[in-house]
């Protein structure tokens, strides 16, 4: 039997050609945009190469759903990275939010959360994400003020900066965002007054949560223009009239204003028929309880304790589900479940 001996040099050449062909085939079949992959790898580096991002490998396709937290646009088949979830990573030391995020121009959704070692301000590079709809930066140690440049991202629908170390005052400019539907800034160190401009959010704006901060001053009268489904301004240092948040013509479902210094006549406010949660405890609210409370078919929670309310508690409807704790420590409230009026 005749044997053919392939020279060593030819064998090496064939191996090199085979490697090139395999690499070329991989490159041609990869869906991930090269610029997006480069940006993601830089983000990984900027975060100290955490072990939780070990699936982000330069030799694999970032659009094949093996890269943790990365999704690409398969609907339009552009396969640009449009969804990035950077949550729960254990960084080796403190790092700022990577400015390299700006190199993912097709991002629609960005979630950064649960990273204790994430520090520093929200970088101006975020303003370059002009297609961003949903921005979440939560449960980190990111600090500084909420930046004005967010008003440049006209596509924003949701802003959630809850439970960080943010300080400074609320930026008036975000009220100009035409598509913004809600803000969640609770659990920070934000101080100062609520801007008057926050009463001029678009009709799409239905949710405001700025609880557990250091807000002072009064709720702007311009809030009468808003139709909020959910508002939570509890645990601040707000004072004065909050009746502008109420109205029988509104679609309000929850109003949480507990632990402020608000003072207004509760008996004179109109109530949304959709109201299912009302928490007004620990304020200086006076007057009587509205009789309209008995007509609220969806009311599930009520707390008006520790105020200056007087008069007989209305009876009927869903009010029968609430016990003494909902009404305790008022000036002169009476009637079931409190002692009877005399």
Curated annotation (Swiss-Prot):
It is a peripheral membrane protein. One of its GO terms (cellular component) is membrane. GO terms for biological process: defense response. Disulfide bonds join 32-62, 63-72, 310-332, 334-341. InterPro entries: Leu-rich_rpt (IPR001611), LRR_dom_sf (IPR032675), LRR_N_plant-typ (IPR013210), PGIP (IPR051848). Its main location: secreted. Residues 1-29 form the signal peptide. Glycans are attached at residues 64, 141, 303. The keyword Transcription regulation does not apply. The keyword Signal applies. It is found in: Secreted, Cell wall; Membrane. Keywords: Cell wall, Disulfide bond, Glycoprotein, Leucine-rich repeat, Membrane, Plant defense, Repeat, Secreted, Signal. Gene3D superfamilies: Ribonuclease Inhibitor. LRR repeats lie at residues 82-107, 108-132, 133-156, 157-180, 181-205, 206-228, 229-252, 253-275, 276-299, 300-319. Inhibitor of fungal polygalacturonase. It is an important factor for plant resistance to phytopathogenic fungi. Substrate preference is polygalacturonase (PG) from A.niger >> PG of F.oxysporum, A.solani or B.cinerea. Not active on PG from F.moniliforme. PANTHER family: POLYGALACTURONASE INHIBITOR, POLYGALACTURONASE INHIBITOR 1. Belongs to the polygalacturonase-inhibiting protein family. Mutation of Lys-253 confers the ability to inhibit the F.moniliforme PG. This is Polygalacturonase inhibitor 1.
């Amino acid at each position: 039997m005749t044997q053919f001996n392939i020279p060593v040099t030819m064998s090496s050449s064939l191996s090199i050609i085979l490697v090139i062909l395999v690499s070329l085939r991989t490159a041609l079949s990869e869906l991930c945009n090269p610029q997006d992959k480069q940006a993601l790898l830089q983000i990984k580096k900027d975060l100290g190469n955490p072990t939780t991002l070990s699936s982000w490998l330069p030799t694999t396709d970032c659009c094949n759903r093996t890269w943790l937290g990365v999704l690409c646009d398969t609907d339009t088949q552009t396969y640009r990275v449009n969804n990035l979830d950077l949550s729960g990573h254990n960084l080796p030391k403190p790092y700022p939010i990577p400015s390299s995020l700006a190199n993912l121009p097709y991002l629609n959704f960005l979630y950064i959360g649960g990273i204790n070692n994430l520090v520093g301000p929200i970088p101006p590079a975020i303003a370059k994400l002009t297609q961003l709809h949903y921005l979440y930066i939560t449960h980190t140690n990111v600090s500084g003020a909420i930046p004005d440049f967010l008003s440049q991202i006209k596509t924003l629908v949701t802003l959630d900066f809850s439970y960080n170390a943010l300080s400074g005052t609320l930026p008036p400019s975000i009220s100009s965002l035409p598509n913004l539907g809600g803000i969640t800034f609770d659990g920070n160190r934000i101080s100062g007054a609520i801007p008057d401009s926050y009463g001029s959010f678009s009709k799409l704006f239905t949710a405001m949560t700025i609880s557990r901060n250091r807000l002072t001053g009064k709720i702007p009268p311009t809030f009468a223009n808003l139709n909020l489904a959910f508002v939570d301004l509890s645990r601040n240092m707000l004072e004065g009239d909050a009746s502008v948040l109420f109205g029988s013509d509104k679609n309000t479902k929850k109003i949480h204003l507990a632990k402020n210094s608000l003072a207004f006549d509760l008996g004179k406010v109109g109530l949304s028929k959709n109201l299912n949660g009302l928490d007004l405890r620990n304020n200086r609210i006076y007057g009587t309880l509205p009789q309209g409370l008995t007509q609220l078919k969806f009311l599930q929670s009520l707390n008006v304790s520790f105020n200056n309310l007087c008069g007989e508690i209305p009876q009927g409807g869903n009010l029968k589900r609430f016990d003494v704790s909902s009404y305790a420590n008022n000036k002169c409230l009476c009637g079931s479940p409190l002692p009877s009026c005399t």
